[in-house]
């Protein structure tokens, strides 16, 4: 009886060890990819089989687009913000936030959002991966890198 118990225990231990997989930390907001996807060097969301269980799981049907909520995949495969899919005309335009930067970012003289290490704990914390764009909700980054208010993405009414 003891030998059967020991064999059973050993088999359970081996299965438990085999079940442990290499877990990667989830993506920070950049890239805006869904779970199990990572952003490649060209900015596209690609399936990461190792981050999703490796050889233990079958690769699921590809989610097209593999972008987070409020993002859609453009023709080149990049995830871009979809202002209509995220509120459209359903919300009133809120008061303008100045500066329109996320927490730990400040607006510099040219209007760009830059990381403020002192406002976020100074030398006690490492500078996080840059959030691209580092703009608050209802703001988008224009071609020059400035955060500008996006009334359509925040529910502005059609005129």
From Swiss-Prot:
Name of protein: U-actitoxin-Avd13b
Role description: Inhibits ion channels.
Biological classification of the source: Eukaryota, Metazoa, Cnidaria, Anthozoa, Hexacorallia
Family: Belongs to the sea anemone BBH family.
Propeptide span(s): 19-26, 59-60, 93-94, 127-128
Localization (cell): Secreted; Nematocyst
Keywords attached to this entry: Cleavage on pair of basic residues, Disulfide bond, Nematocyst, Secreted, Signal
Coiled coil: none
Membrane-spanning parts: none
Superkingdom in the source lineage: Eukaryota
Signal peptide span: 1-18
GTP-binding among keywords: no
One GO cellular component, as annotated: nematocyst
This protein's record includes keyword Disulfide bond: yes
Disulfide linkage: 33-45, 36-52, 67-79, 70-86, 101-113, 104-120, 135-147, 138-154
